[in-house]
Amino acid sequence: MANVYDWFEERLEIQAIAEDVTSKYVPPHVNIFYCLGGITLVCFLIQFATGFAMTFYYKPTVAEAYSSVQYIMNEVNFGWLIRSIHRWSASMMVLMMILHVFRVYLTGGFKKPRELTWVSGVILAVITVSFGVTGYSLPWDQVGYWAVKIVSGVPEAIPVVGVLISDLLRGGSSVGQATLTRYYSAHTFVLPWLIAVFMLFHFLMIRKQGISGPL
């Protein structure tokens, strides 16, 4: 095993990377509230794992979406647990994200030179809410259907482009199969890629600039 490690160490400099990661200075004023962002990340990883597991059984059609969710809950081994964890973790992720935003704002973490970290965080917050909106509709039950109908109808109040935005969200003039397909695609492909990119940027900025000082 030592020879294998030495082979990788010679090429990747694993020890140097490990020392750089573990030797970062942590200011003495840091407390448990500075962990809220990390907890949000953990919730996202749980979301990713449980959501990925459910894609093996979920059917994104208006005729089969609800029955496939019932199948996950009642027939799939531990399916009820996986979906329940997905729902609980979603709520926890939103809560931790809100608390994290408040912590950063109240401690002045958005000030120079961390403006871009703050902006990327706000974008991540918008993406997180978008996850909630798109995921809420996927069971295609009464609650999900009417939630989509209301959300997709709100932009119609915008002058000139409102109807165009609503039609884009619905995939047409009314809520139907095209709507569910778009929300499923956004929830499982578009939004995960977006949040991964902005998370990487967010963490790199934190790594580069360090944790903000006390007020």
UniProtKB/Swiss-Prot annotation:
Stored Gene3D superfamilies: Cytochrome Bc1 Complex, Chain C
Keywords: Electron transport, Heme, Iron, Membrane, Metal-binding, Photosynthesis, Thylakoid, Transmembrane, Transmembrane helix, Transport
Keyword presence, Transmembrane helix: yes
Residue spans crossing the bilayer: 32-52, 90-110, 116-136, 186-206
Compartments in which it is found: Cellular thylakoid membrane
Residues reported in the UniProt entry to bind heme b 2: 86, 187
Cofactor(s) the protein requires to work: heme b; heme c
Biological-process GO terms, alphabetical: photosynthesis; respiratory electron transport chain
Major subcellular site: membrane
Binding site for heme c: 35
Summary of subunit composition and partner proteins: The 4 large subunits of the cytochrome b6-f complex are cytochrome b6, subunit IV (17 kDa polypeptide, PetD), cytochrome f and the Rieske protein, while the 4 small subunits are PetG, PetL, PetM and PetN. The complex functions as a dimer.
Described function: Component of the cytochrome b6-f complex, which mediates electron transfer between photosystem II (PSII) and photosystem I (PSI), cyclic electron flow around PSI, and state transitions.
Membership in a protein family: Belongs to the cytochrome b family. PetB subfamily.
Protein's name according to its UniProt entry: Cytochrome b6
Record gene name: petB
